[in-house]
Amino acid sequence: MKNYEAVIELIFNSNNGQIDLLTGALAPEQFDQIAKRDIAISDRNSTEISIISIALDLHKYLTIENKLDEEKTKSDIEAELVKLHFELKNLFRQSDCICRVSKLGFWILLSGIDEVAIKQVLDRASKTLPDYVASNLCQRAKGEKLLDWYKRVDKLHFSNNK
């Protein structure tokens, strides 16, 4: 199955405005509110703010066995997303905002920590998370608008499963 779009379409992705109903992560609407607040604080205090994008890389995740059965693949991916959310909650600070932004992944908003600390967090995550999980860092440029920043994060987030 070279084209994963059929399987991706089957994956449950719904929220009630507050949380993702599959994983329990924050819903995008909540994430946006927190991001807007943290950007205002970051601009006022001249602190850094970043988003780490975490996504399942289906090219690495899918095995020959589950490529043959779409329903099993869907079920396996959903179970992996739930497991991944719990791993992320253990890896990041309680104050870091974890949101399920797509059918295959999460964004984590990191506020008030410098580039060195972020790189340490990413290093720890790469050692802890499975090989089929892709992570990318996108720091907000000073004065950058929210949507422009999200556009840059989107490019990183969705680049793995094309």
Task: Please identify what each model-predicted range represents.
Residues D96-S111, L129-F158:
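A short glycine-enriched loop-to-beta-strand structural element that forms part of the catalytic core
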Residues F31, A35, E78-L81, H85-L88, ...:
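Heptad-repeat coiled-coil signal-transmission/dimerization helices
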Residues R44, L68-D69, D76, L81-E115, ...:
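Conserved helix-loop-beta segment at the catalytic/binding core of cyclic-nucleotide signaling proteins
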Residues I34-K67:
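Active-site-proximal structural segments of metal-dependent nucleotidyl cyclase/transferase enzymes
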Residues M1-I39, N66:
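Signal-transducing coiled-coil linker helices
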Residues N15-L21, A55-S75, F92:
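Active-site loop/short helix in cyclic nucleotide turnover domains
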Residues K60-I64, E115-Q120:
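Short, conserved charged micro-motifs
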Residues Q120-T128:
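Short amphipathic alpha-helices in soluble, non-transmembrane regions
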